[in-house]
Design a protein with these regions (language model features):
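Catalytic core of tubulin tyrosine ligase-like
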Residues: 1-144
């Protein structure tokens, strides 16, 4: 996977986060995609600072992997006053949406845009998926 590093990321309380979105592709022809409404919001555990070119980046500032951040003895996150279910370095989407609403962000409109990106990403991979399905999936209309 290759991704562009965002130098000025959206943060919550100064902490970087990412979204773990669960997607199931049950058919390629016709294309059938399901996006689970609940996911995970995973946090870095130190306040965000832009990386310096001549120094090694602090993984607790820039990475949101639970397997890395669970070892941070100086973890800055435990919960959020605007979300009942926000606890620790992994939140539910429900907790994240509570914080978005508290900041007057239309979570439904945002999630609609996220779904659109997910679908377009899968469509961009469709030629490769089609090839793999032709070789390995006995029934093209049903993956399972």
């Amino acid at each position: 996977m290759v991704s562009h590093y965002i130098a000025n990321p959206l943060t919550i309380d100064g902490l970087k986060f990412d979204l773990r979105i669960y997607v199931a592709i049950t058919s390629i022809n016709p294309l059938r995609i399901y996006i689970y409404e609940e996911g995970l919001v995973r946090f870095a555990t130190q306040l965000y600072q832009p990386p310096l070119i001549d120094s090694e980046a602090d993984p607790y500032v820039h990475l949101t992997n639970y397997s890395i951040n669970k070892h941070n003895n100086k973890c800055l996150i435990a919960g959020h006053e605007m979300a009942e279910e926000a606890d620790g370095i992994k939140w539910s989407f429900k907790a994240w949406k509570q914080v978005l609403k508290a900041h007057q962000v239309n979570d439904e409109k945002l999630f609609s845009k996220i779904k659109d990106i997910v679908v377009k990403t899968i469509i961009s991979c469709e030629p490769n998926l089609n090839s793999a399905f032709e070789m390995y999936v006995p029934h093209r209309s049903n993956c399972f």
